Amino acid sequence: AIAGEAAALGVELFVLDDGWFGLRDSDSSGLGDWQVNTDKLPGGLEALVPRINGMGLSFGIWVEPEMVSEDSCLYRSHPDWAFRIPGRLPARGRDQLVLDFSRREVRDSVYGQLKKVISSAPVAYVKWDMNRSLTDVWSAALPAGQQGEVFHRYVLGVYEILERMRQDFPDILIEGCCGGGGRFDGGMLYYTPQIWCSDNTDAMDRLRIQYGTSFCYPTCTMGAHVSAVPNEQNGRITPLAARGIAAMSGAFGYEMDLSRCTPEEKDEIRRQIETYKTHWKLFHQGDYYRLTDPFQDGPFTAWAHVSPDRRKAVVSLVAGPAQTAPPFLALRLKGLDPGLRYRINGASASGGDVLMNAGYPLPEFRGDYQAMQLYLEATE
């Protein structure tokens, strides 16, 4: 039902999240056993993926290869493959331990399982997750005098297995994730050109998160999704328009059960997807301009994506809580050609110099967290 609704609304990729493998019936079991649970998915991916593809959707899958559950076949067979300081109980995070990816035999075992699963069906996307920090970093394969090397060896091991995946599956998009953006860095971006920016999907918090991340990384690398409300992290309720516009400043998607949406919400989602597809080149290849600083607690946050030739732009704005008798507000744009005139949302035209100096007059926002977009195109 979810996939069918997604396809009808214009979604292009359907991702199967945690729980599809081993005896993964809770957070405390199954990690490390990367075989499809055929009780949950009869016929495996070989049966599921063609059905998804038949709806016009590509298929993606979630994995967390660096972790292991103590309640797993892998751990019971090889308890020494997990980081653990001799003579001490290990520190658990999310009821899981960290596999020693500094060891070739560990990487070979895990990757062999993953390769078999991914090869079984036309997988287009892999979300590579990592949901706890490294503790008890002690490798059973190295003497005490070399334990200081383990952190570095571990990272090289992660890179090595990702490189193997890239070589074996060059057409698959790998998205990195680490409890959100905990491992958002240049090294991982080489292997995973898209990284989940944060597990905090609240639209208002994301304005700050994505603003800060943009100082180091292109917006097209930031995984950014619309999620359900009340938001599961903070309980905030924001309009669907605000959530959609906030997510469009990154690698856009939806993290919610679309089959539960109202007809009005589905219409809005369809429009958002059409907008993102129409302006995809601008969002991913245009020049990014920060028009306001969300850390200054102003009345709104705004940004723009401008084409390199400065003839087109998408300006996005999300307002904060509503104000009684608000002052007149104008948004000064950036990146336009001062000598050109721009048609705004297909209607009236204004000069680039006017829009960048006097600004675009904003409407009065009634209600909390209102949002809008301006679509600019040069008239000459």
Residue map of PLM features:
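Short acidic/histidine-rich active-site segments
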Residues: 124-135, 175-182
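Solvent-exposed beta-hairpin/edge-strand motifs
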Residues: 334-348
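C-terminal beta-strand-rich structural cap/linker in extracellular carbohydrate-active enzymes
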Residues: 352-380
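Glycan-recognition surfaces
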Residues: 74-108, 152-259
